[in-house]
Amino acid sequence: MNIKSLLLGSAAALVAASGAQAADAIVAPEPEAVEYVRVCDAYGAGYFYIPGTETCLRVHGYVRYDVKGGDDVYTGSDRKGWDKGARFALMFNTNSETELGTLKTFTELRFNYAANNSGVDGKYGNETSSGTVMEFAYIQLGGLRVGIDESEFHTFTGYLGDVINDDVISAGSYRTGKISYTFTGGNGFSAVIALEQGGDNDGGYTGTTNYHIDGYMPDVVGGLKYAGGWGSIAGVVAYDSVIEEWAAKVRGDVNITDQFSVWLQGAYSSAATPDQNYGQWGGDWAVWGGLKYQATQKAAFNLQAAHDDWGKTAVTANVAYELVPGFTVTPEVSYTKFGGEWKNTVAEDNAWGGIVRFQRSF
């Protein structure tokens, strides 16, 4: 065998061996393209697409720290020192488009810590009102909303003023289970109808331990609103199925200028009782009013006053100052006069209190 034949045979053997090994080798798949998070600007700032879906998600919330001193303007009692509390609120919004309209969800979790004084020697550190709660959780498709939310008796007219102690004279209960439908026209007109489970006493002052319905008949709320560039006017009527009584509110807002606005709200209840879920003010009627002046881009002045049929008067003023974007400091002072039928329910007729709120929103 000559050298040429030997070399050709060796080369053929090597080719055959390498071909056999290649047949047994594992071929790595091509790497999949990475899907980065995409911004979703269809519903406002802060939304992004959940990867692999067409659903937009927003995560936001705030961290808050309150320092209170003076009297408790809700009860008239002396705090005897500082009361302090903190809250971390975490909120989730989802939005997506369907053939029946926009499908939305909203959830809010609150982590609370509150500590007050002993009430005897003013020593700080008595822990109260601490814990974690799922404050809201609802689903909305078009105008239909189901879940845990605030009562339409509060939200449809626009709450009260932009002050912290806004409900010294309560305008009704807050959180409730509900099924509601809101119609929004293209001409500024809107209407709402809601079937509600009743509040959980987070907005009341006396009376029953809760305001939940006690059978299959829900509370019923209905309202009408008209809004334009000048402001808005809204009215709501609510039926309490437990005590079979009703309450109503009418509110008007007027924008005097781009910086200055005023509002006035009146309410009437068919039953002057603290067991009324909606008419939680004292007596048959109550009135609230206020103003807001945006002094600068960073500072806003807010004032609110209220009076009810049983003789309670409450006045609150604050200045909300945004130190830097997302961080606001709000000093507030409040005064309550317990007159008329309220006079015998408190130790002191007059209560002065102050609060400073530090809040970082994100």
From Swiss-Prot:
InterPro entries: Porin_alphabac. It comes from the Bacteria. One of its GO terms (cellular component) is cell outer membrane. GO terms for molecular function: porin activity. One of its GO terms (biological process) is monoatomic ion transport. Coiled coil: none annotated. It is found in: Cell outer membrane. It holds the Pfam family Porin_2. Residues 1-22 form the signal peptide. It is a multi-pass membrane protein. Keywords: Cell outer membrane, Ion transport, Membrane, Porin, Signal, Transmembrane, Transmembrane beta strand, Transport. Forms passive diffusion pores that allow small molecular weight hydrophilic materials across the outer membrane. Consists of 16-stranded beta-barrel sheets, with large surface-exposed loops, that form a transmembrane pore at the center of each barrel. The pore is partially ocluded by a peptide loop that folds into the pore lumen. Belongs to the alphaproteobacteria porin family. Homotrimer. This is Porin Omp2b. It comes from Brucella suis (strain ATCC 23445 / NCTC 10510). The lineage of its organism: Bacteria, Pseudomonadati, Pseudomonadota, Alphaproteobacteria, Hyphomicrobiales. The gene is omp2b.
